[in-house]
């Protein structure tokens, strides 16, 4: 049974095709479970990718593997830029949901401002057929993306901060 997150679940179940959503909060508060539950109601291809503590290329390769596993890509294709992955996905006829979880891992292992700038470009130009959900646990790093000086400022159609459930809600 899924309890205590009805408001957040309803928000995530909305149609965000062509938009980006951010979900953040402390570790172990239910971000991934909430996202997975919301994805059950989306009747389109979906892919869940947990960022690696590695290079951009490691993460590109990992995302491509998940796209193949989700049968969005028929075979692994070679990409050297995240923007190219999303540009390719944007040419596909079907709408889809792409979840990028543990986004701070990507920022911690690569130039943080560059990663945000890459995702700014993706959100602005390469998700017409995609609902993009970015999630993470490093609250400071996730909040940083919401600040006016950040490349991702104003780019999220919805921002969901998950707090721990109270005893009564759980």
Show where each model-derived region lies.
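Phosphate-binding site recognition
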Residues: 1-170
């Amino acid at each position: 049974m899924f309890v205590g997150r009805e408001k957040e679940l309803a928000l995530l179940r909305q149609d965000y095709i062509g938009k980006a959503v951010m979900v953040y909060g402390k570790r172990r508060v239910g971000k991934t479970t909430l996202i997975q539950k919301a994805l059950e109601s989306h009747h389109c291809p979906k892919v869940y990718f947990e960022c690696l503590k590695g290079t951009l290329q490691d993460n590109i390769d990992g995302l491509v593997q998940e796209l193949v596993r989700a049968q969005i890509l028929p075979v692994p294709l070679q990409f050297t830029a995240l923007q190219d992955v999303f540009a390719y996905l944007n040419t596909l006829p079907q709408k889809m949901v792409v979840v990028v979880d543990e986004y701070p891992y990507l920022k911690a292992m690569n130039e943080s401002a560059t990663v945000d700038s890459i995702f700014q470009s993706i959100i602005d130009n390469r998700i017409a057929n995609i609902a993009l959900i970015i999630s993470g646990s490093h609250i400071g790093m996730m909040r940083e993306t919401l600040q006016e000086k950040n490349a991702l400022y104003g780019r999220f159609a919805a921002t969901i901060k998950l707090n721990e459930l109270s005893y009564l809600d759980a």
